[in-house]
């Protein structure tokens, strides 16, 4: 068991309230825990889908049901997409073993696929791409790494910048400038719309000029 007096800073934890089972989370964990979140604005991710695919009717949301952060993201994005007029369906899978079957089911029933920031999906982007790309179903991802593996676009944060922010928080704690018990979770301030040039070309998609190509090397 960790020592409660030692400050603990998390880095890139998507949703602290969900991860730590905090009811009514207000942005500050309290105690000896704080850190940074890699949560992109989910309403803007939904808006991105509408911007790119306004004529689509159905969106399938694929995620690992074992990851609480993923459940939070898909529930939120689903609600936002439904406000925009889409018909949405959640497609959870328990682990990598049934990722292919669930992805195939989602692909068969959806015009567009959305995948959140999800560790299991990130480890299985090849499976998602091998099913969705041949079927001509575009995937919009919650973060750049997944978009690089199987997506057409994402609203990306800089994990480097987020790490720098975490480091600055640590420095403030060590020098006594800040008390971790009252230090709110820090979020990324800048988001960049990015696209996967390889998959977009394969699907015949031309994205708006403000989208930046993902480095595929």
Show which residues each predicted segment covers.
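Hinge/beta->alpha junction and helix N-cap segments in small-molecule ligand-binding domains
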Residues: 36-43, 63-73, 90-99, 119, ...
């Amino acid at each position: 068991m960790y020592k409660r007096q030692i400050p603990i800073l998390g880095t890139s934890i998507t949703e602290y309230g969900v991860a730590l089972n905090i009811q009514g989370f207000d942005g500050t964990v309290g105690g000896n825990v704080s850190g940074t979140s890699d949560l992109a604005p989910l309403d803007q991710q939904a808006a991105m889908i509408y911007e790119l695919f306004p004529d689509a009717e159905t969106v399938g949301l694929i995620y690992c049901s074992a990851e609480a952060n993923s459940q939070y993201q898909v529930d939120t994005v689903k609600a936002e997409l439904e406000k925009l007029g889409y018909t949405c369906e959640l497609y959870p899978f328990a682990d990598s073993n049934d990722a292919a079957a669930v992805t195939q089911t989602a692909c068969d029933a959806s015009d567009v696929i959305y995948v959140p920031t999800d560790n299991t999906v990130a480890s299985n982007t090849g499976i998602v791409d091998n099913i969705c790309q041949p079927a001509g179903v575009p995937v919009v991802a919650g973060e750049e790494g997944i978009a690089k593996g199987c997506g057409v676009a994402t609203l990306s944060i800089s994990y480097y910048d987020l790490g720098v922010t975490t480091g600055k928080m640590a420095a403030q704690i060590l020098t006594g400038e800040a008390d971790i018990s009252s230090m709110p979770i820090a979020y990324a301030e800048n988001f960049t719309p990015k696209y996967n040039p390889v998959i977009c070309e394969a699907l015949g998609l031309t994205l708006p000029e403000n989208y930046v190509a993902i480095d595929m090397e």
